[in-house]
């Protein structure tokens, strides 16, 4: 980590494939990553080694992420003893957070944003 960062741990926010990489990064760099926010992405990793808290935002109708995979990831993180909160947004599709996409859902995006900001404040500003 660059010395200019000034904090011992970082938060990671990733969308789709970026969320997948964020989940993996928490396992690969546990001393550096304190919080992970994944938008519509699941992943694998040795979550017992992670030191992060996890927040996930998922679409109800996602052609790329099955609800069973989301539930399995949440269970895996929880069983590893890590703080985790996953939300599924009714009536949404993959990319619901991104205003330049046809799947954009303003109400769901606003709620996800509020949850994300609160989560990062709690986890990173303690």
Q: Predicted segments — roles?
A:
Residues 1-126:
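N-terminal cap/leader regions of alpha/beta-hydrolase-fold enzymes
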């Amino acid at each position: 980590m660059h010395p200019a960062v000034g904090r011992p741990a970082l938060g990671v926010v990733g969308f789709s494939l970026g969320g997948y990489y964020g989940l993996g990064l928490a396992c690969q760099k546990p001393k550096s990553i304190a919080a992970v926010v994944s938008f519509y992405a699941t992943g694998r990793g040795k979550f017992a080694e992670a030191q992060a808290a996890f927040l996930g935002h998922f679409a109800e109708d996602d052609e790329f992420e099955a609800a069973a995979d989301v539930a399995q990831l949440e269970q895996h993180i929880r069983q590893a003893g890590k703080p985790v909160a996953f939300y599924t947004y009714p009536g949404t599709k993959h990319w619901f957070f991104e205003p330049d996409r046809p799947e954009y859902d303003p109400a769901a995006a606003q709620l996800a944003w509020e949850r994300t900001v609160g989560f990062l404040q709690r986890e990173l500003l303690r």
